[in-house]
């Protein structure tokens, strides 16, 4: 049996130049596996703790405490363990080495979700190496998934909200090539729409409007959210993919939810007179008008993470036609997913491994969601690294959808390129989710 010989963590940098954690797991057969953790800009209040150092170095964002926790606490405790035993190792780290709990479960407040996750991801890669199988297959075996499917990519091509320095309140405007017949073709469609969008924006708003945001999407200085949708519609038409490429949105509404329970669509304006504040009901009606006019198939975080009332209304009224995705609402937390399955505020899970902090808990959240008939979208964070784990995760769990930015910026393309390699490796066994992106496989 191959076992863990040592674990080494270090501080590296994410795509925004902020520190993050990377971990190497060395095995006693001389091989090693490496994983790095991403971090988000618009974070949900219910996410597991991302441990930062505070103080003045790195604007308080150093991760030397988390690195130390891996090197001095987690690492030594894992020596001699079998890396193929993912669930046992994750549970040992989360429940015994850390052991902190809040009302939503294991909150990782002692060691940090970033410390635990770096090791959890590296263990998963090491387990695949030991079994001499691809990472996506190892993940499928851990989860008990028999049918692997390549996801539909959701390219975030217009950035607003906390990801961009423009006035746009809503955070992401995405394109999904559901009409492609393979992942390779989906990439072609996405890339061509992206380049058409660039020329449309340049012509309408000038050269500097094609500067890109954190996730590689364009950030033109428009204020009307509808204008973002109109730009996408035009670019899709110009590329010749009307009907084959559809639209998704991530509103990240918690970012502009106010204490009086209104939503401020002008929250980024310095001299804000409050004239753009609207009620949850009015915001719901705005979404419904968008859905009536544009080929929208997915809306993520349409309301604040605690505004379950409007979430539920939206899902009841539009849930058949459009998937309502919970991100800040669910934070990939099995307990919150269970509550949502019981109360119906949404009908899809956004899967972000660093919100919960371990591979095992992420798989649990996905399996629960699939059993409830929900869609699942695997996701990057806005502060990313070159690590491609989520590409394999999306195939291994047959999520059916993945969002990892625009077809621009290497830390985003790293994931998409890995999916191209996986599709090639699977050969004639490769299945692309396409129009079945919400339910690509039977629950496992």
From Swiss-Prot:
Q: Where in the cell is it found?
A: Cytoplasm
Q: Which GO terms describe its cellular component?
A: phosphopyruvate hydratase complex
Q: Which SUPFAM superfamilies match?
A: Enolase C-terminal domain-like, Enolase N-terminal domain-like
Coiled coil stretches, renumbered: none
- EC numbers, comma separated: 4.2.1.11
Active site (record annotation): 215 (proton donor), 352 (proton acceptor)
What SMART domains does this protein's entry cite? Answer: Enolase_C, Enolase_N
List the Gene Ontology MF annotations in alphabetical order.
magnesium ion binding; phosphopyruvate hydratase activity
Which InterPro entries does the record associate with it?
A: Enolase, Enolase-like_C_sf, Enolase-like_N, Enolase_C, Enolase_CS, Enolase_N
Q: What is its main location?
A: cytoplasm
Report the leader peptide range.
none
* Comment on bound cofactor: Mg(2+) is required for catalysis and for stabilizing the dimer.
Q: Where does Mg(2+) bind?
A: 250, 300, 327
Q: According to its UniProt record, in which pathway does this protein act?
A: Carbohydrate degradation; glycolysis; pyruvate from D-glyceraldehyde 3-phosphate: step 4/5
Family matches, as PROSITE patterns: ENOLASE
User: What are its cofactors?
Assistant: Mg(2+)
Identify its protein family: Belongs to the enolase family.
Q: How does it assemble?
A: Homodimer.
What is this protein called in UniProt?
Enolase
């Amino acid at each position: 049996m191959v076992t863990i010989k040592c674990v080494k963590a270090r501080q590296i940098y994410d795509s925004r130049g902020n520190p993050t954690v990377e971990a190497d797991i060395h095995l006693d057969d001389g091989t090693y596996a490496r994983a790095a953790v991403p971090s988000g800009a618009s974070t949900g209040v219910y996410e597991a703790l991302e441990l930062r150092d505070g103080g003045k170095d790195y604007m308080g964002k150093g991760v030397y405490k988390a690195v130390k926790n891996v090197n001095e606490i987690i690492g030594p405790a894992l020596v001699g363990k079998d890396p193929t035993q993912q669930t046992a190792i994750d549970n040992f780290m989360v429940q015994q080495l850390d052991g902190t709990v809040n009302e939503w479960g294991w909150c990782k407040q002692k060691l940090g979700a970033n410390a635990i996750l770096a090791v959890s991801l590296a263990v998963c890669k090491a387990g695949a190496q030991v079994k001499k199988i691809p990472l996506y297959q190892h993940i499928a075996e851990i989860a008990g998934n028999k049918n692997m499917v390549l996801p539909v990519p959701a390219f975030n091509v217009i950035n607003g909200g906390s990801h961009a320095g423009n006035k746009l309140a809503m955070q992401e405007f995405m394109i999904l090539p559901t009409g492609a017949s393979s992942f390779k073709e989906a990439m072609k469609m996405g890339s061509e729409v992206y380049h058409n969008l660039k020329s449309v924006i340049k012509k309408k708003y000038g050269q500097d409007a094609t500067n890109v945001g954190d996730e590689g999407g364009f950030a033109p200085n428009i204020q009307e959210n509808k204008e973002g949708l109109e730009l996408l519609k035009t670019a899709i038409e110009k590329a010749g993919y009307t009907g084959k490429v559809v639209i998704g949105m991530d509103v990240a509404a918690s970012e502009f939810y106010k204490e009086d329970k209104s939503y401020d669509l002008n929250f980024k304006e310095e001299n804000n007179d409050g004239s753009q504040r609207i009620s949850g009901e009015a915001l719901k009606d705005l979404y419904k008008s968008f859905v009536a006019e544009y080929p929208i198939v997915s809306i993520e975080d349409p309301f604040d993470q605690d505004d379950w009332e409007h979430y539920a209304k939206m899902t009841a009224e539009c849930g058949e036609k459009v998937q309502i995705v919970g991100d800040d609402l669910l934070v990939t937390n099995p307990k919150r997913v269970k509550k949502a399955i019981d109360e119906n505020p949404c009908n899809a899970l956004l899967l972000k491994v660093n919100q919960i902090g371990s591979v095992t808990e992420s798989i649990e959240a996905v399996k629960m969601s699939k059993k409830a008939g929900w869609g699942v979208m695997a996701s990057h964070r806005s502060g990313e690294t070159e690590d491609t784990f989520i590409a394999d995760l999306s195939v291994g769990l047959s999520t059916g959808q993945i969002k990892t930015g625009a077809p621009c910026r290497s830390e985003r393309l790293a994931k998409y390129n890995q999916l191209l390699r996986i599709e090639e490796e699977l050969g004639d066994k490769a299945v692309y989710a396409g129009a079945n992106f919400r339910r690509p496989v039977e629950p496992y």
